[in-house]
Amino acid sequence: MNKKSKIIVFASFYPKKEKNNEVKEIILTMIDPTRLEKGNEIYNFYEVKNDNDKEISFHLFEIYKDSAALDFHRNTSHYKNYRSKITNLLDRPIEVKVLTSINSI
């Protein structure tokens, strides 16, 4: 991975039943401090409701200036704190995809 290329991350969270609000609140605490990080360009939070709103998933779309900015993010106290709190509230591990641009603007 080129250190100077923008890094695009798509992370998906699937809460255990009855843990939707807790997961949502933990992720919400990440937004402001992450957006203040020098290398963060975008940190957007989304929700998907399926099966008559019974199944909910949350998704983060993140863009970092370069891989050093992503490394910095993953070493912050707010990142480490959120990871320690959220893991046991999820039905399965966080799905993290690092996207590589083929053709983008």
Predicted regions mapped to residue ranges:
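Glycine-rich beta-strand-turn "strand-cap" elements at beta-sheet edges
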Residues: M1-S5, N44-E55, S84-I105
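Short, well-ordered beta-strand segments in beta-rich or mixed alpha/beta enzyme
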Residues: I7-Y14, N44-R74
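Short, surface-exposed ligand-recognition loops at beta-strand->loop->(often short) alpha-helix junctions
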Residues: P15-N20
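Aromatic/hydrophobic pocket-lining residues that form π-stacking "cages" and hydrophobic walls in ligand
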Residues: M30
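An amphipathic, aromatic/His-enriched active-site/gating alpha helix that lines ligand/cofactor pockets
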Residues: P33-E41, I63-K97
